[in-house]
């Protein structure tokens, strides 16, 4: 089983407009989905045929509505109830542009976090892979992801951690490390105090190898936008280049990439297959107007066009 964690989920509402007229009425038809990075991961894993359970925190009327959306989408879920109201996030697509309005979300009480820790411990004991994605809600300290990473890894699960900022830094400094981290180039430069470009792969490899924070993490994947990504796994280094595709909605492509990693790692795939699968998922999400959803009938075409080269 693969477990996905979304600590700060949202009801995502998408508006498609030919033009956004400022300071005037814009009539729209909303498309609503159960949102949050971990739920995007869960949706894609469901498409890939994995046994997946989504967990996290839900509260209020929006939380109840979100549970209905998950059930309607066939996403198995086991969330912990909270008193606060689950947030709403707006995504406005207009004239080739994308504008997002994101609520902060509720503040989590200590007893609510304790209840989630107990729930997570129970679910992680049954999981082969755990994905932890996105931001922490208010009231939760930055070291919490490091804490539950240790719980899952001690239970025998492999943790794929997709976060940034203080939460990522705390996980890198912890005694028990995740199986995979996936910072982008800007984030990795911030962590290393460097200014590497997409051409500086050898220098990046050397910097990671000499930094004790990354020494016990089997997979370090650095996403580089249109330039693809580089992956470092147990002393080996790879560059993945992806094909040009007709992008419709790039939101959720990073989450879909994490789903691809989870799917392939859970299946025990070799390094090249892991990277090709993950990058294929990211591209196929960008080709679909729905966030966290793959254009599966293009799988073979895109997968075969992803080039993975060992460095």
Residue ranges of each PLM-predicted region?
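Gly/Ala-rich phosphate-binding loop of Rossmann-like dinucleotide-binding domains
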Residues: 46, 149, 153, 266
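Short acidic, glycine-rich surface-loop motifs adjacent to enzyme active sites
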Residues: 124-139
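Short, small-residue-enriched loops and turns at beta-alpha junctions
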Residues: 107-109, 136-140, 167, 190, ...
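Conserved phosphate-binding/catalytic region of the ribokinase-like
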Residues: 201-311
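Conserved phosphate/ATP/ADP-binding segment of small-molecule kinases
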Residues: 146-237
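Glycine-rich phosphate/adenosyl-contacting loop at the front of the ribokinase-like
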Residues: 1-55, 62-65, 311
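Conserved N-terminal subdomain of the carbohydrate kinase-like
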Residues: 47-127, 300-311
């Amino acid at each position: 089983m693969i477990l996905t964690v979304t600590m700060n989920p949202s009801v995502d509402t998408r508006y498609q407009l030919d033009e956004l007229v400022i300071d005037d009425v814009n009539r729209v038809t909303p498309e609503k989905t159960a949102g949050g990075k971990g739920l995007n991961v869960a949706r894609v894993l469901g498409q890939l045929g994995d046994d997946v359970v989504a967990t996290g925190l839900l509260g209020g009327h929006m939380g109840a509505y979100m549970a209905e959306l998950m059930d309607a989408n066939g996403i198995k879920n086991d969330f912990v109830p909270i008193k606060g109201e689950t947030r709403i996030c707006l995504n406005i697509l207009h004239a080739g542009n994308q504008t997002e309005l994101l609520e902060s979300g509720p503040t989590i009480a200590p007893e609510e976090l304790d209840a989630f820790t107990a729930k997570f411990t129970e679910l992680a004991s049954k999981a082969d892979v755990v994905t932890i994605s996105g931001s922490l809600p208010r009231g939760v300290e930055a070291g919490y992801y490091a804490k539950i990473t240790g719980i899952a890894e001690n239970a025998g699960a492999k943790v794929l951690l997709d976060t940034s900022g203080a939460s990522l830094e705390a996980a890198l400094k912890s005694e028990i490390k995740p199986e995979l981290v996936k910072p982008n180039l800007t984030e990795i430069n911030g962590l290393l105090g460097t200014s590497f470009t997409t051409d500086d792969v050898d220098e990046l490899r050397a910097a990671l190898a000499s930094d004790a924070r990354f020494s016990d993490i089997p997979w370090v994947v650095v996403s580089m936008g249109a330039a693809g990504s580089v992956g470092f796994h147990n002393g080996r280094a790879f560059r993945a280049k992806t094909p040009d595709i007709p992008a419709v909605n790039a939101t959720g492509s990073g989450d879909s990439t994490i789903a691809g990693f989870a799917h392939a790692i859970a299946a025990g795939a070799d390094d090249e297959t892991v990277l090709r699968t993950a990058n294929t998922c990211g591209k196929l999400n960008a080709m679909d107007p729905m966030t966290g959803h793959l254009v599966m009938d293009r799988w073979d075409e895109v997968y075969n066009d992803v080039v993975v080269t060992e460095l």
